[in-house]
Amino acid sequence: MTDNDDRIKLEASWKEALREEFDKPYMKQLGEFLRQEKAAGKAIFPPGPLIFNALNTTPLENVKVVIIGQDPYHGPGQAHGLCFSVQPGVPTPPSLQNIYKELNRDLNIPIPNNGYLQRWAEQGVLLLNTSLTVEQAKAGSHANAGWQPFTDRVIEVVNERCERLVFLLWGSHAQSKQKLIDPQRHLILKSAHPSPLSAYRGFLGNGHFSRTNKFLEQNGKTPIDWSLPDL
């Protein structure tokens, strides 16, 4: 997994911003780990071309909002590199169902029949998991594989290079990244995680989507159209 590896397609602005990371020992070790896992016959999600989908879909200069997830969905056909999102034709996972419930409550947005969040990413919502790969049926299996320093650097880059972003930190894992964000430059919104285990302890009712758009408009930015088409 080097900058010259033709299998790693990274959007130009991110490639420039993260160039040094790809030369660091941890990243080379991560690449070797993934190669060994695949060689051992393990199913790794998402597929290789989609590992950096969040960065490739939302160029650095387009970022307005950052949503921090944990690791990809670990079922076949679900993950495609955007946190909380699933590919078309896959049932909407429980956490995303609660995100839709809050969107409906907060902004009266209809609940779509799918969990495909590509349209958010194309508008500047960086849907970043802190681990970008996972082994099939083993949640969190790559949490210590080496992704954390890389995705921490992604958060640091958007913190440093972008102005007046909104960071949505849902749950303790996402909130552990708050230390990487300057609250004088950006709006940080925190609540419980949308998981069914915690959604009723402060996620539902948090008003984060309307508050995000109000902040963007106050800072001269086009608000996010959170509505999603049925597929």
UniProtKB/Swiss-Prot annotation:
Entry-linked Pfam families: UDG
EC number: 3.2.2.27
Major localization class: cytoplasm
GO BP term (any one): base-excision repair, AP site formation via deaminated base removal
Catalyzed reactions: Hydrolyzes single-stranded DNA or mismatched double-stranded DNA and polynucleotides, releasing free uracil
UniProt keyword Ion transport, yes or no: no
Family matches, as PROSITE patterns: U_DNA_GLYCOSYLASE
Keyword terms: Cytoplasm, DNA damage, DNA repair, Hydrolase
Subcellular location: Cytoplasm
Family of this protein: Belongs to the uracil-DNA glycosylase (UDG) superfamily. UNG family.
Protein name, as recorded: Uracil-DNA glycosylase
GN (gene name): ung
